[in-house]
């Protein structure tokens, strides 16, 4: 059984159904196929009709069975040419594929490794909470919200001072430093995590009662995720954002439409959902302190190493503190990052961030 995902039906063989989906960040074949079930996936002149080629490649791999084939025909354009397609497939899929054919703008891939690691299950989770010992009531509320999810197998790892109630599911990860080394703390949590599915937060989040149900609806086939994050008044609190320009340029940070995606998109440092195997490949830079752009750094390295960050809109977390105000929204554009109009106080906000980073590092270094 296979599927033709081209915009217009090309294949006429009996075992190939046609299912076209307009490419965007929501692209998935989950409504028409089971994961890792298809003998082949065929696409003609779809891969570079938009900027979402990384999402298409990743999704096709998820639904192709072991030994199955992914056949991509491409009409080269300014978004992606044939050589770039081959390079992207190698980067994204790594050692999980064999290239069977690559001539005349036709690429044929064979899947040789399953997507999920052994024992990886949506019913098994390691939650990590970074704390500095303050706001103990917030920390207890977050712990209780996780326990209330009633996940079959889970643990809660706390890195930082904790004097709360002793519970079997709560484990303390020792960290001996007064410096705000949040990246080192996140690495310690991931190192000690029992399960492949990890969710790391700062101690300021409450998990919505349907968070776990939303994760099951999204599915276990992901690398790095954000979920919806809401402020006290239910406005978006940095849940799906982009730097808005090249990493070495002055930022134009703003929110993205949930169905949008950008190569300079990044996840705010307060919450990450990721696989332990991804962390092993791309750990946090332990030398970076809070406020030194550690979220930008790891998001850039995720992208450069071929991991695709997405957002799960079926799950919600509420933040008890959001310091960055309301970001403007980029307009959706399937070819490039859309337009945004920043409010007049944006340069002031950006300058404050630079000053805060400088003063923090100066204080720590004496």
Task: Please provide the spans of the model-predicted regions.
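A short glycine-rich, Lys/Arg-flanked "PGG" loop and its adjoining helix->strand segment in the class I
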Residues: 54-66
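Short, acidic, metal-binding catalytic loop of nucleotide-sugar glycosyltransferases
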Residues: 141-153
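Glycine-rich, basic loop-to-helix element that forms the pyrophosphate-binding segment
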Residues: 176-193
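Short aromatic/hydrophobic "clamp" motif used to bind/position activated sugar donors
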Residues: 198
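Conserved donor NDP-sugar-binding/catalytic core segment of glycosyltransferases
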Residues: 212-245
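A recurrent flexible, glycine/aromatic-enriched loop bordering the glycosyltransferase active site
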Residues: 253-274
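Donor nucleotide-sugar recognition loop
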Residues: 269, 281-300, 304-311, 316-317
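Active-site donor/metal-binding and catalytic loop motifs
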Residues: 311-331
């Amino acid at each position: 059984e296979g599927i033709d995902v081209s915009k217009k039906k090309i294949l006429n063989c009996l075992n190939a159904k046609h299912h076209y989906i307009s490419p965007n960040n929501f692209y998935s074949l989950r409504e028409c196929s089971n994961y890792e079930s298809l003998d082949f996936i065929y696409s003609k002149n779809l891969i570079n009709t938009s900027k979402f080629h990384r999402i298409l490649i990743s999704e096709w791999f998820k639904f192709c069975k072991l030994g199955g084939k992914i056949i991509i025909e491409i009409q080269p354009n300014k978004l992606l040419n044939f050589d770039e397609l081959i390079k992207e497939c190698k980067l994204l899929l790594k050692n999980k594929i064999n290239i069977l054919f690559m001539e005349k703008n036709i690429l044929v891939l064979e899947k040789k490794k399953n997507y999920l690691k052994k024992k990886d299950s949506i019913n098994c989770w390691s939650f990590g909470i970074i704390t500095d010992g303050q706001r103990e009531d917030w920390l207890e509320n977050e712990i209780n919200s996780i326990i209330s999810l009633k996940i079959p197998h889970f643990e809660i790892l706390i890195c930082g001072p904790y004097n709360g109630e002793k519970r079997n599911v709560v484990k303390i990860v020792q960290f001996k430093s007064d410096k705000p080394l949040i990246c080192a703390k996140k690495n310690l949590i991931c190192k000690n995590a029992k399960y492949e599915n990890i969710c790391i937060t700062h101690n300021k989040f409450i998990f919505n009662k349907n968070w776990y149900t939303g994760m099951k609806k999204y599915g276990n086939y992901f690398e790095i995720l954000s979920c919806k994050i809401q402020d006290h008044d239910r406005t978006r609190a940095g849940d799906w954002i982009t730097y808005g320009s090249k990493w070495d340029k002055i930022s134009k940070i703003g929110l993205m439409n949930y169905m949008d995606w950008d190569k300079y998109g990044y996840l705010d440092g307060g919450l990450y959902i990721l696989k332990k195997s991804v962390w092993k490949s791309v750990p946090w830079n332990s030398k970076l302190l809070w406020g030194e752009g550690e979220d930008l750094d790891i998001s850039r390295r995720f992208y450069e190493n071929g991991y695709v960050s997405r957002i799960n809109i079926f799950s919600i977390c509420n933040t008890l503190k959001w310091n960055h105000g309301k970001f403007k929204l980029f307009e959706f554009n399937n070819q490039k990052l859309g337009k945004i109009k920043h409010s007049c106080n944006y340069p002031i906000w950006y300058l404050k961030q630079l000053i805060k980073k400088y003063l923090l590092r100066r204080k720590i270094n004496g």
